[in-house]
A protein has these predicted regions:
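Post-cleavage N-terminal segment of exported redox proteins
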Residues: 1-28, 76, 103-109
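Short N-terminal micro-motifs specific to bacterial/archaeal maturation
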Residues: 15, 23, 64, 88-91
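Gly/Gly-Pro-rich "capping" loops immediately C-terminal to redox-active cysteine motifs
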Residues: 29, 33, 45-75
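The canonical Cys-X-X-Cys-His
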Residues: 32, 36-46, 100, 104
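Axial heme c-ligation environment in periplasmic c-type cytochrome domains
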Residues: 51-60, 75-109
Length: 109
C-alpha cells in the first residue's frame, strides 16, 4: 500500500511539474520581435528599408537622422516622414511601440 501511495504522489508531482518544464523549453519569440514582424517587417525586412534604402533601422543610419533612443523611434512611428505609415496609439499601443523600439535598437546594430 505504501508503494502505491508513493507512486500516486510521484504521478501527481509529475502532472504539476511537467507543464512548467515544457513551457520553459518552448522557444518564445520576444514581444518586440513579434510586433516588429507584424507592423514593420514588410517595409523594413532585416532592418532595411524598401522605400528609402538609405534610411535603414541600422544604428549608423538612425544616428545620421537624429534617432538615438527608443523614445526617438516611437516618435518616428507616431509622426513619420513622407513614405512611412503613421502608427498612432490606436494602431500600436504605447507599450507595444516601446517594445518595437527596444527590439530595433537591440537587433539592428
Amino acid at each position: 500500500m505504501k508503494t502505491l501511495a508513493k507512486v500516486g504522489v510521484l504521478v501527481a508531482s509529475m502532472c504539476l511539474v511537467l507543464p512548467a518544464v515544457l513551457n520553459a523549453a518552448e522557444k518564445k519569440e520576444p514581444a518586440g520581435e513579434k510586433l516588429f514582424q507584424q507592423h514593420c517587417a514588410a517595409c523594413h525586412p532585416g532592418g532595411g528599408n524598401i522605400i528609402k534604402p538609405a534610411m535603414t533601422l541600422h544604428k549608423k543610419d538612425l544616428d545620421a537622422h537624429g534617432v538615438k533612443t527608443a523614445k526617438d523611434i516611437v516618435g518616428k512611428m507616431r509622426n513619420p516622414g513622407p513614405g512611412m505609415t503613421r502608427f498612432d496609439a490606436k494602431t500600436v499601443s504605447d507599450k507595444d511601440a516601446q517594445e518595437i523600439a527596444e527590439y530595433i535598437l537591440k537587433t539592428f546594430k
